[in-house]
Amino acid sequence: MELGSIKLTWTILRELNGATLYLCNRIVGKMQFETKLSGLASGDEAWKQSNIREWLNDEFLNKHFTDEEKNRLVKHNDTGDKVFLLSSEEYGNGGDVINAKETWWLRPSGDSAAPPFVDTLGYAKRHYAGYFTHGIRPAILVRD
């Protein structure tokens, strides 16, 4: 499937409630994981306040998707994101089709203050975000 103005390619991970979960086949940028909160935020709150979430759902979404394509995207998780990072659970469910040549962020959840990432061997790990830069591999949920 090709979506977006620069023809990013996507891998189908699974069907989910009448929609299809896709992961971008490549890293589209690299960032540190930062939040707007002072101190350490954990899990869901860290994602809600993160610079990566803001970038994906503003600059990335508007640059790479037409209005028609945006209308096909289903809002995901309690933050209503149209573009997001996979959670550790979503990654675990599709790990056999996910290429891990570089490190890339996963979406934090739960109560850990250390966001997860995928290492070059394909393992999901955690470390404190402010010190490291990892790749961004967007995920989308598309209405069938």
Tell where the protein language model's regions lie, with residue ranges.
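Collagenous Gly-X-Y triple-helix signature in extracellular proteins
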Residues: 1-144
